[in-house]
């Protein structure tokens, strides 16, 4: 049982602004790894396609994020603000385009077909969840798997922010201008919604696994785009959707 005296999971309102103060986005999230969150959000919303489209990204003294975007990204942002906006409806209304064809590599396909290995990875994921161990719950956890190893773990009160942080960290570590895909598998502790499925596709993530299930709209996105999803991934007979 969690300690009843344990501190509540941290949550804050974080603004993402352009240098002139124009608001790009506002999140309710766990205020950690905010640069990763901002960069990942840009990729996951389809606002940038390459890391070199973000010319500057830094934290302000007030704990917010300020970023300077290239011309192409600012044009996409203007269309996003005017016509779409964030949220579940956008995930189904707007065309969802991956930066590269989505197809898990052979190693990832073998991993997704092995419930024992997936189960071990989820145990490792939860063992490495630093904030969850401190706060006793109330946080979503995700991991990025490359070459069969977990290379990054992100935690947040927001499921969407977990995905943004994982993607942002991967793009920050990649060479400037490299295409937004590296064949990674994303592990998630929570339900995969249409919004999250759309984020994964736009970021070029080919495969995801969850201990929960995808929603029906997420399954629809997976089938249309080739995104591979494994649900109930710790069961002996998990469910498989999309590009599997």
Roles of regions detected by a PLM:
Residues 159-241:
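Feature captures the catalytic cores and cofactor-binding loops of soluble hydro-lyases/lyases
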Residues 145, 241-242:
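Short beta-strand-to-turn element immediately C-terminal to the catalytic PLP-Schiff-base lysine
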Residues 1-147, 152-157:
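Intrinsically disordered, low-complexity regions enriched in acidic/Ser/Thr/Pro/Gln residues
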Residues 1-6, 178, 243-244:
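Short, low-complexity, intrinsically disordered N-terminal peptides in bacterial proteins
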């Amino acid at each position: 049982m969690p300690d009843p005296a344990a501190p509540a999971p941290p949550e804050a309102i974080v603004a993402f602004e352009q240098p002139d103060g124009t608001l790009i986005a506002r999140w309710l999230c766990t205020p950690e790894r905010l640069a990763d969150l901002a960069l990942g959000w840009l990729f996951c919303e389809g606002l940038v396609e390459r890391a070199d489209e973000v010319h500057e990204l830094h934290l302000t003294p007030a704990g917010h994020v300020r970023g300077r975007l290239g011309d192409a990204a600012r044009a996409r942002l203007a269309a996003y603000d005017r016509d779409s906006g964030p949220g579940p409806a956008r995930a189904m209304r707007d065309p969802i385009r991956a930066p590269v064809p989505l197809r898990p590599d052979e190693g990832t396909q073998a991993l997704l077909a092995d419930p024992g290995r997936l189960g071990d990875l989820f145990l490792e994921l939860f063992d490495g969840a630093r904030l969850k161990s401190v706060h006793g719950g109330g946080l979503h956890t995700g991991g990025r798997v490359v070459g069969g190893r977990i290379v990054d773990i992100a935690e947040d009160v927001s499921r969407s922010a977990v995905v943004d942080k994982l993607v942002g960290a991967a793009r920050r570590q990649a060479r400037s201008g490299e295409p937004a895909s590296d064949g990674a598998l994303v592990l998630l502790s929570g339900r995969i919604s249409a919004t999250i499925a759309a984020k994964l596709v736009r970021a070029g993530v080919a495969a995801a696994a969850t201990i929960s299930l995808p929603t029906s709209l997420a399954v629809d996105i997976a089938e249309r785009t080739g995104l591979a999803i494994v649900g109930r991934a710790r069961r002996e007979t998990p469910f498989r959707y999309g590009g599997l």
